[in-house]
Amino acid sequence: MPDFLDLLAQDAKTTVEEGYYDTNAKFHAGNNSMNNALSKSQNMPIIAEIKGMSPSRGIISKSYIPENVAIAMANGGAAGISVLTEPKHFGGSLSNLARARQAVNLPILMKDVILSPLQLDVALQLGSNAVLLIQAVFDRGYGELGLSEMIDEAHSRSLEVLLESHDENEFERSLKSDADLLGINNRNLGSLTVDLNVTKRILENVNAKGKIVVSESGIKNADDIKFLRKSGATAFLIGSAIMSADDVESKMNEFTQIEKLER
């Protein structure tokens, strides 16, 4: 029986076919490596995410200005920025990506349900430094190419890959891939339930072999970061908690300055 992940992938295929990703816009990405930014961050390594809504919460932020949000995230110590470009379920847009790129010099991750090389072309055109690929999307056969081929296609465009998994089997296979960063999504994209223990369970049972592991979804406060870091995560992707804050920069500081505040 199809679940929400199937719906996401089917809608992504339709969005590609409808021409959503056809654009002539071009913005220079700069030589910004998300991998390097996370590994060398002087703060808690956070990828801050720009999005207006989510399937689980609905509207998160109604009238945000992408440039202003990106600048506030940068001022708050973000190592990198993720921009949702998926339009149907996350309220994302290609315009938000382009506007964020023009506003800051941080590495930018294009966050979408990517299954076509055309989406990689757009990521490059709009100034992304990295893209998200979801292991389960390719396991279910939605990719126009196989996962390893899509990673190669991203690398041929000088795009780094954050490869997302949700269970031990997926994570073990992601370790064998050529992905630059490994993501663990605490949200089950089939049922939309969230459990921070997903990261803990996976990293207790699978050796990450020194790779940067980004824990994603469900992070609300500093205690969550401490729990996930103790569990073995090395970086963190946070969206809703930041986008719903009255003061984005202050909220960013709550996350990025954890170690400094404890000294």
Predicted regions and their residues:
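Short acidic, glycine/proline-enriched helix-loop-strand junctions
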Residues: N105-L106, L145, S156-L159, K209-K211, ...
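C-terminal helical cap(s) of enzyme catalytic domains, especially alpha/beta-barrels
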Residues: L196-V206, R229, S244-R263
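Active-site beta-loop-alpha junctions enriched in small/polar residues
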Residues: K51-M53, E86, V113, A136, ...
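N-terminal active-site wall of soluble small-molecule enzyme domains
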Residues: P45, R57-K111, L115-A154, L159-L162, ...
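Structural recognition of alpha->loop->beta junctions
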Residues: E67-G80, G127-N129, K176-N188, S231-T234, ...
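Catalytic cores of alpha/beta
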Residues: L115-G127, H166-D178, G210-S215, I219-I238, ...
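An N-cap/entry alpha-helix motif that binds or orients negatively charged groups
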Residues: M1-S61
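Glycine-rich phosphate-binding active-site loops on the catalytic face of alpha/beta enzymes
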Residues: Q125-G141, G183-L192, A233-M252
